[in-house]
Amino acid sequence: MHRRNILSAALAASGAIFAAGSRSARAQTQPPSRDAAKVVYHLSDLEKVQFALGNIDNHLAGAGGPEKVTIQLVVHGPALRAFHAAAAGPETARKVAGIAKSSVKMAACGNTMRGQNVTLKELLPGFTVADRGGVVLIAELQAQGYVYLRP
């Protein structure tokens, strides 16, 4: 009886290893579906603006270009100050223009805009307003299957 249990366990383990290897091979040969490549970047820390914009550039390149991934950047809180056109540095302006050309959607929190007394026209080009708030938009995007990233 003991030998039979050992044999059964060995066969079960072999089957599990084979199945896992088979799934892994399929995952490497099949391209990801469009639905699997939706990401929302949450940015509220002023000191992380350049880092987050660099992450988005790297994400686009690593995914194989803007046609392979849908990215939405949602900015609120102190980080929004970096995107005021009058105060944005040249590096920020260049990176924002680049990701906007790559079809990255950018939304500014309407609550933060009111708090900072800034209008959409005063932000760098490419932004829309999250009228009900940045965190509300983030939650809605997550409900739509977006992966949440906060650099």
Region locations from a protein language model:
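Acidic helix-start/capping segments at beta-turn-to-alpha-helix junctions
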Residues: 70-82
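Structural recognition of the beta-strand scaffold that forms the well-ordered cores
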Residues: 40-42, 72-74, 105-108
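Short, glycine-rich nucleotide/cofactor-binding loops
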Residues: 42-53, 83, 87
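Extracytoplasmic
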Residues: 36, 66-68, 101
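C-terminal segment of N-terminal export signals and the immediately downstream linker at the start
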Residues: 20-41, 48
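Histidine-anchored nucleotide/phosphate-binding helix
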Residues: 52-65
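A cross-taxonomic marker for long C-terminal extensions/tails that follow the last structured domain
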Residues: 86-151
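N-terminal export signals
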Residues: 5-25
